[in-house]
């Protein structure tokens, strides 16, 4: 596709150029909304921020176009440049740019075999660490650095409270949870017993380390009927460790929903006032 000429100050041409200028750090995703890269993750942001970015971009374009018009003695170009500071022009360019970005919508958190951590990206297949890139399109990040071979006396002590016959199994399941893949047995673990068996300490530590990869599941997701609003399921989009803290007295699990969550590679839901989106 041909690039618009630098002296083409139509809304369409300006939006094309503005989209090229921001697409490395801005994205628009179906069913999610507008996102901006902060150096570690892509975060959902208000559309007003794109309008503000368009304002500063058009201010620079206006200055350059005005200088060019004066050198040429081009009164038409000079007049066109003046309108780039108008609220309507700024809003129109931002709106068109959002559509251009949506037309090139990326897939978020797509690679199940890598983990975004504070000091880079871990390849879970090899244990190697690499630099983070915007094109990874992470929306989640662990709260800790990756340090190969690291040990913690507190963690070792917490594990000792877990019954010995289930200790290694629990460690494997929690480790597997950091991948984006469904467990081989397609089951949902339930941790039961009194308050002295280490379950709260172990889950608390893992959830804290997993950062935004860990979520607390709302009651309605597992207890509600199938007719509940689909926004509930969006709480686990991109999550790798989902914890349902405690079954309320008299509560009944939705068996069909449990089976779906444990064995389905793709789920569908939507945020409030957004379109449905399918995610892994």
Map each language-model feature to its residues.
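Active-site proximal loops enriched in glycine and acidic residues that flank catalytic Cys/His/Asp
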Residues: 193-195, 206, 246-251, 271-273
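Intein modules and their embedded homing endonuclease domains
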Residues: 1-142, 264, 269-270, 279
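AAA+/SF3 P-loop NTPase mechanochemical coupling elements
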Residues: 231-237, 270-280
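Short, well-ordered loop/turn and helix-capping segments at boundaries between secondary-structure elements
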Residues: 180, 208, 212, 249, ...
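Acidic/polar loop patches that form or flank catalytic/metal-binding clefts of enzymes
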Residues: 1, 214-219, 252-255, 267-272
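Charged, alpha-helix-enriched surfaces in structured cytosolic catalytic cores
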Residues: 13, 49, 169, 201, ...
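P-loop NTPase catalytic core of nucleic-acid-dependent motor ATPases
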Residues: 25-48, 55, 107-109, 114-240
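Conserved AAA+/SF3 P-loop NTPase catalytic/coupling segment centered on the Walker-B
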Residues: 238-263, 276-277
């Amino acid at each position: 596709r041909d690039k618009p000429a630098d002296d083409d100050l139509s809304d369409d041409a300006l939006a094309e150029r503005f989209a090229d200028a921001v697409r490395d750090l801005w994205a628009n995703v179906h069913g999610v909304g507008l996102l901006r890269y902060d150096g570690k993750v892509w975060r959902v942001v208000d559309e007003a921020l794109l309008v503000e970015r368009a304002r500063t971009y058009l201010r620079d374009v206006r200055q350059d176009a005005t200088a060019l018009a004066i050198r040429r003695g081009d009164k038409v170009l000079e007049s066109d440049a003046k309108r780039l500071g108008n609220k309507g022009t700024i809003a129109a360019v931002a709106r068109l740019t959002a559509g251009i970005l949506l037309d090139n919508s990326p897939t978020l958190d797509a690679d199940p075999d890598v983990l975004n951590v504070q000091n880079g990206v871990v390849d879970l297949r090899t244990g190697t660490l690499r630099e983070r890139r915007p094109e990874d399109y992470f929306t989640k990040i662990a709260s800790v650095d990756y340090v190969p071979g690291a040990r913690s006396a507190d963690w070792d002590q917490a594990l000792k409270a877990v019954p010995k016959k289930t200790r290694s199994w629990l460690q494997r399941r929690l480790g597997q949870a950091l991948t984006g893949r469904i467990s081989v047995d397609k089951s949902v673990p339930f941790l039961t017993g009194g308050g002295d068996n280490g379950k709260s300490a172990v889950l608390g530590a893992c959830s804290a380390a997993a950062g935004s990869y860990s979520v607390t599941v709302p009651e309605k997701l597992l207890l509600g009927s199938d007719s509940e609003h689909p926004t509930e399921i969006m709480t686990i989009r991109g999550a790798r460790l989902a914890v349902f803290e405690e079954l309320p007295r008299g509560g009944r699990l939705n068996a069909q929903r449990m089976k779906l969550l444990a064995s389905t590679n793709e789920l569908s839901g939507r945020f409030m006032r957004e379109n449905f989106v399918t995610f892994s």
